Amino acid sequence: STTVRAPFEMPEAEWTQPAATDGPLAQIAADVTARAETLGDQTDHSDAGISGFKLLDRGEDALRWRLSLIDSATQSIDTQYYLYHSDSAGLLFTSRLLEAADRGVKVRIIIDDMGTLAVSPSQAKLRDSMGALMIAHPNISLRLFNSSGNRGLLGRAWNFTTDFEQLNHRMHNKSLTADNHATIVGG
């Protein structure tokens, strides 16, 4: 069965200000705009006069917004996460990414390998099956940052106690960007 979800509706920003008109940010914006126009970008720039953000201070709200962005994406989804577990939120997030990929959306995922650590054999099996589903999908690109050669808990513990450079070389980014238009950052 197909689930139909409402399209993403941009919330009113809690804080907005006019776009920069001088200084380095204005120059960067002008350069990016000129480059996009050179490449034939047909993006609607009707909201180009403002920039803003909305604080999402509750985990439940942040998850709902992430799912809404995933559900509304039509072209691309880019994610970077330090932690990605096979808990209920991780399973929901993964299922929505798979649904988006089924709609033809290109999904790119980068996960820090330390953040994929499973604490039980059942969690490891679920994590690996989720990963296999995503890797097999033609519209999903899944990459592990600083991956460990050992997949098990003891093997990883050994690696981390003997290789301090790997232990301290982490990707702690947390972001989701839909259609290069809206981004959620943070945990």
Residue ranges and their predicted role:
Residues 1-2:
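N-terminal Sec signal peptide cleavage junction
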Residues 9-20, 36-73, 83-187:
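HKD-type phospholipase D/PLD-like phosphodiesterase module
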Residues 15, 26-27:
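N-terminal, Lys/Arg-enriched amphipathic/low-complexity engagement segments
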